[in-house]
Amino acid sequence: VPSLQHLKDGYYQILMRESDIPFTAVSTPSGMLWEWLVMPQGLSNAPATFNRFVSHILRSVRDFAPSYFDDIFVHSRAMNGMTDLEVHRMHFRRVMEIMKVNKLYSNLKKCIFAAFEIPVLGCFVGKDGVRPDPEKIKAINEWPTPQNVKNLRQFLGLATYLHKYSKNYAGIVHPLSQLLKKDQEWQWTDECQNAFLTLKKSLTEAPILALPNPDKPFYVVCDASNFAIGNALMQRDDDGHERVISYCSRQLRGAERNYPVHDKELLSMKYALAKHRVHLLGPEPFTVFTDHASLRTAIKSPHLSQRMARWLSFFSEYNFTVEYKP
């Protein structure tokens, strides 16, 4: 059960230190000087100060009440024989007590209490997982065929924002990205049109991504093609079904396209571990699945190129096993 607390007036809830008040003086057309008694917007250290302040006072409840600037996200699950709503009520009360002691005030018009899902940084998070903003999906679905480079850049800007919901995004978008190269003549071919329609379909039919559960093992599925690499971070839910937490992909750079297939697959694995480092780095073991069987023994081979030796040094930070999955 999630809830959203939106703090009222943000920066203005932090008082200025008395000795710093004169430094905030601003001149008005009437010739008068006005000084800020609370922290104004525009100071270079204001965002960090505000975020640090909110995070600090909520440090004792950060396991179920993380914050991001003026938003506090309270989430709860059933535990110890209590329902999720009962646990949520207890968690929410603790957060409110902390806010009361520290004189933090909420904007009730923007707060959401015990909802099915809440908006978080451009997406919606709920019990079932994470889904994209329907307004952005609608914009993608209704986007007309680009007529020039500017139109294409605008479309890809929005599409890239949603790329974590699309399997093999980099591979699909490859023909379109070629049109953005310097001195490239604009030619909208059938291949570009198919890529455009495929990308729209991939995003409009985006799956609901699962929320990561640190108590369950992670596994990563990697793959590589002639011009792109991609991966998916996954877990199994309580019913044993595979759930995707995030898709991730990118196109191969100039020199990387000349790598042999073995090295491309290994690069895909390295890219996956780097992208999902926050979830995978640690003592808990996880599994990497690949469709290239030789990678199972690559990390133990005594004959390594300098490039592979560097990559294996990177892999040594992680506790994982490689399994073949055709």
Region locations from a protein language model:
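Retroelement reverse transcriptase polymerase core
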Residues: V1-T287, S294-W311, E317-F320, K325-P326
